[in-house]
Amino acid sequence: MPKDTKPLTTAAQGHDGWDRRSFLKAGGLTVGGLGLASLIAACGAGDGSGPSNSGTLTLRMPFMADMQVPDPDIFYEAEGLQLTNATYEGLAKYQPGTATIVPNLATGWTISPDFLTYTFQLRPGVKFHDGTAVDAEAWQKSFERRKVVEGGPGYMVKGVASTAAPNPTTFVVTLTEPNNAFIHYLACPFKPAAVSPTALSANAIGDDHAQQWLTTHDAGTGPYTIKEFVTGSHYTLEAFPDYWGDKPTFQTVRIEVTPSIANQKLQLDGGGLDLATKGFPVPDILAYKGNPEFTITNTAGGIGDAIYLNQSAGIFADKALRTAVLNGVDRTSIVATAWGGMTTAQPGMFPDKCFPPELAPMPTKIDPQALKTMVAALPSKKLDLACAVDGGAPRQQMAELLQSQLSDAGFDVSLRVMPLAEQFDLTNQPPERRPDMMIAWLGGDTFHLDTTFRIAARTGAAPVNFFQYSNPELDRLMDEAILQPNEALRNEVYRRCTQLVVDDAIWIPLCVPPSTTIAHKNVTGFVSESFIPMTLQLQDLKRT
């Protein structure tokens, strides 16, 4: 008997062999759920007292860098997610602020007991931006396109054996093997989206499935549609008048490519911007918190910051030394100092919404003396510490505080900032050319741990298994986890997976960085995407 649709919590439903082989194939060095770029929203010029009501129909927002192409089957990064989530929608989504899965373009679904067949009841009356109806056959073609395009998020449909459209409002997906993470793929920020077959057919060049056209246009169902997409300059969105849900207040959204946080701050202070969602240093955030003209909201998502240790070469090829670092570093003080009390050190390896921390707690006893003793005996005490650039000022400060602690332990630490291009090329480098230690994000595409383990720790996975960790027992367990019929059994397998990586001391979790929105007090209606909360639901924003 199929199960009735119910909200699914943290670890509902992974996949054997679905590591992201085509992770960066079609769009440059980008990373899902990752990349962590700033988005700023603005409306009109101001006099220092905040944006005026005369500009309520236009919202202006900078990105810190150009985004990847807005094709939903290629796009796979955080920068630009604001745009793609405003133009495309999936069958399901995460309820804001939670790991619970709720309907979106589907009104409900049933899942067979063997996790092989998913039957979706489709929302009636939904239209694509070209005016055509969204029906089950359109969903079949959308799934087919994601599979054949083979972009970064293509792994999400690699395990689909077939789809069916028994009637216009019923869409059936059958998998090749059980996968209790599949419904999370359909709800995450990089989910398979409804793409208009009419637009694809009209704009295809040969067998490119309209990829060229979709570099500057969209074919979705979202509250906004792309009016302009000018690389290196700006992107303009317009409200879709036939949107099935709540109609947007802002008729136009203009996104400027603005790399400088200092420039963004000047515009925010002068009233030229409505809000900022990420990238400001903690002292600035705290200053805005004390300013009655602004409101501050902090939201935690599903990706944490962590210390990576290079177990493949150099001084940390010694497991005992890695363990001494894990037990000797004061994570609590690093996080508290760098973040000014805005977040705390993670109690477990993964964010709370991904896995209950009490099932696999991190050690709480700190033993710096044991680390000092081991370092004193090392023939070379040089340590290359890299800090991934996309974490902004707080991550940089955490790296500096870590450098200080390691220096006190006797290491000769060199700290450097690592560009994203270098970070995502690490798997192509010999082990000895990788840094000894790195601070970067740690997470997957969903709140389900399968995507984290499979992309960051699976044998041979690239490019996010940065130091090419390999543990056959972990590979076996992550394959076992996705077959479990309920959350309790699945969590027990993931507890064992987590214990393996803790015992091997390859990762040391730091914190879940808060996504901070700084807004003029007359801007309201903030609803964030749950997994990557710097992405706002633009249709909910209002100016009072």
Annotate each language-model stretch with its function.
Residues 1-22, 33-38:
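N-terminal secretory signal peptides
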Residues 61-113, 144, 219-221:
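N-terminal lobe/hinge region of extracytoplasmic solute-binding protein
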Residues 340, 344-377, 392-397:
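Structural transition elements
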Residues 240-286, 412:
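Ligand-site clamp/hinge motif
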Residues 517-544:
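Long beta-strand-rich cores associated with HINT superfamily self-processing modules
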Residues 95-96, 190-247, 252:
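Gly/Pro-rich hinge or "lid" segments in bacterial periplasmic/extracellular proteins
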Residues 121, 155-203, 228:
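Surface-exposed binding/hinge segments that line
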Residues 414-424, 451-520, 544:
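Extracytoplasmic/peripheral linker and loop segments enriched in polar/acidic and small residues
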